Amino acid sequence: MIHKNWAELIKPTQLEVKPGNDPARQATVIAEPLERGFGLTLGNALRRILMSSLQGAAISSVQIDNVLHEFSSVAGVREDVTDIILNLKQVSLRMDVEGPKRLSVNAKGPAVVTAGDISESAGIEVLNRDHVICHLDDGADLFMELTVNTGKGYVSADKNRPEDAPIGLIPIDAIYSPVKKVAYDVQPTREGQVLDYDKLTMKIETDGSITPDDAVAFAARILQDQLSIFVNFDEPESAGRQDDDDGLEFNPLLLKKVDELELSVRSANCLKNDNIVYIGDLIQKTEAEMLRTPNFGRKSLNEIKEVLSGMGLHLGMDVEDWPPDNIEDLAKKFEDAF
């Protein structure tokens, strides 16, 4: 049965987010357990998406009074234009409106010009307001117009130059990605009695426009969306649902008691100790949940999976409205059918 290709793989059941020194920017995200090899597969894919594909905001061009090109200097400003541009690249923004938008800086010396001196605009927030842009000497004047836009990844300066760009407009390399650093590590982990699983640990740092755990969530959603085109079949209907002449809305096999299955003594005792009475109780358990049962190992798991497969069922199924209120009466009603 095709569903066994994915239904029999263990799925991560634990996702832990450990905030860093700055919770809005730094966090460690831990997911486990994963099938062996999936830690590397998912870690590498998520890292690439985090660094390249999330939407962010950045300054894409600047126009400075009395400056024609980036290799100029401004009277009374200690930094040359090239240094000012480098500093503008590091301004972190949160932008909740469609771009491009125009902002400005108007300062008089003596002064230290910071990102906090950038004019305010609805829907745009400067996050690192203490970031230094330049220093003005006494009597110096500085006026800049900044173009702010949204995008993803890295966009070079030549692509940020409009076709109708006025003289003096200097395009800037825009780094839109809100994620600054991503590192991941894969370690072995235990699930029940089995040691052969992966634990994925990701350390993430953002610019503050998005939290690390949200960044991972968005990256996972992007990956999910990109992979969906490769699924070239329709999911079979859940074996847990079945309308019949008696109005029963699930497979009557789910009313069969697990002690009627031909299981080993160890497996049967484990199910009994875990208060699993009916097959309907059993199939809603995931592999990870079963492996956490005391004295329940991979051998018992494979035995149960084989028995369920012969009935057209598998672990991890979803059965709505289970258990029914009159489960004992229903079980007796369908007892002869078993």
From Swiss-Prot:
One of its GO terms (biological process) is DNA-templated transcription. It catalyses: RNA(n) + a ribonucleoside 5'-triphosphate = RNA(n+1) + diphosphate. InterPro entries: DNA-dir_RNA_pol_insert, DNA-dir_RNA_pol_RpoA/D/Rpb3, DNA-dir_RpoA, RBP11-like, RNAP_asu_C, RNApol_insert_sf. Residues 1-234 are annotated as: Alpha N-terminal domain (alpha-NTD). Residues 250-338 are annotated as: Alpha C-terminal domain (alpha-CTD). One of its GO terms (molecular function) is DNA binding. It is an enzyme of class 2 (transferase). Keywords: DNA-directed RNA polymerase, Nucleotidyltransferase, Transcription, Transferase. GO terms for cellular component: cytoplasm; DNA-directed RNA polymerase complex. Its EC number is 2.7.7.6. NCBIfam families: PRK05182.1-2, PRK05182.2-5, rpoA. DNA-dependent RNA polymerase catalyzes the transcription of DNA into RNA using the four ribonucleoside triphosphates as substrates. Homodimer. The RNAP catalytic core consists of 2 alpha, 1 beta, 1 beta' and 1 omega subunit. When a sigma factor is associated with the core the holoenzyme is formed, which can initiate transcription. Belongs to the RNA polymerase alpha chain family. The N-terminal domain is essential for RNAP assembly and basal transcription, whereas the C-terminal domain is involved in interaction with transcriptional regulators and with upstream promoter elements. This is DNA-directed RNA polymerase subunit alpha. It comes from Ruegeria pomeroyi (strain ATCC 700808 / DSM 15171 / DSS-3) (Silicibacter pomeroyi).
